[in-house]
Amino acid sequence: MEFVFLGTGAGVPSKGRNVSAIALQLLEERGQTWLFDCGEATQHQILHTSVRPRRIEKIFITHLHGDHIFGLPGLLGSRSFQGGTTPLTVYGPKGIKQFIEVALSVSTTHVKYPLEIVEITEEGTVFEDNEFHVETKRLSHGIECFGYRIIEKDIQGALLVDKLLEMGVKPGPLFKRLKDGEVVELENGTILNGNDFIGPPQKGRVITILGDTRYCEASRELAQDADVLVHEATFAAEDEQQAYDYFHSTSKQAASIALQANAKRLILTHISSRYQGDTYKELLKEARELFSNTEIATDLKSFPVDR
């Protein structure tokens, strides 16, 4: 599991930062990539990374401001043009379906893969399978905006091979049956319960990715005990009133949410273009004064998510 930040700016592109898009690489977990937001030129940013459009399985849109969605039509079309055939699902607020369908229709763009568009109308679970569970809550922004909590389900423990070998069980079909939790009888009459030969499960990771938002309770709830919290930090602490007026957060407010939620790690993104050069490091300094395990994303930077 690895983050690749494709765009980390706020509102409009700048020389140093493109607009919002985050790839969550799940190559080891499911051989796929999930994308969170898709601002203008996202597909161009992808060219500079290891992200492959054909592997993008899901796109989660936080809200419908242009800096979070204007890259969608181009990416969807290019994925088809480049030979993508596997299904893709886009999740987002009401209106995302109309935006995509009109853009593709007017431009006579035809995708050759199954494209499903899911409009989120209620908080709660938006996706679940045997590996992941994705929940959402409304945030506090000028328009409807969602944050996402991605919960990796616990992974079954490893088969205790050494313990089986000590009992004279040889590698082969019995190993698989025991791994599946079956009760088996050996040739000498010994009964073995597979559950007795499985190590402790690996606890799944929790990732929280928030859209644009003021400081709010929903952010804390989504981030509770997260292994990684990705939070916007559009403004410095001294501009807290301006952040409130424009429905955004400061770096210190992001750190406060991480602290209250008992998150393990905080990554700041959505940085205003007013912070050019190294001036953005002041945002990082402010956040670390409150929550030490804070990092700040820059375009094309990767962050592995360890267990």
UniProtKB/Swiss-Prot annotation:
InterPro entries: Metallo-B-lactamas (IPR001279), RibonucZ/Hydroxyglut_hydro (IPR036866), RNase_Z/BN (IPR013471). GO terms for molecular function: 3'-tRNA processing endoribonuclease activity; zinc ion binding. The active site is at residue 67. Zn(2+) 2 binds at residues 67-68, 212, 270. Its cofactor is Zn(2+). Gene3D superfamilies: Ribonuclease Z/Hydroxyacylglutathione hydrolase-like. SUPFAM superfamilies: Metallo-hydrolase/oxidoreductase. Keywords: Endonuclease, Hydrolase, Metal-binding, Nuclease, tRNA processing, Zinc. Homodimer. Belongs to the RNase Z family. HAMAP family: RNase_Z_BN (MF_01818). This is Ribonuclease Z. It comes from Bacillus thuringiensis (strain Al Hakam). The gene is rnz.
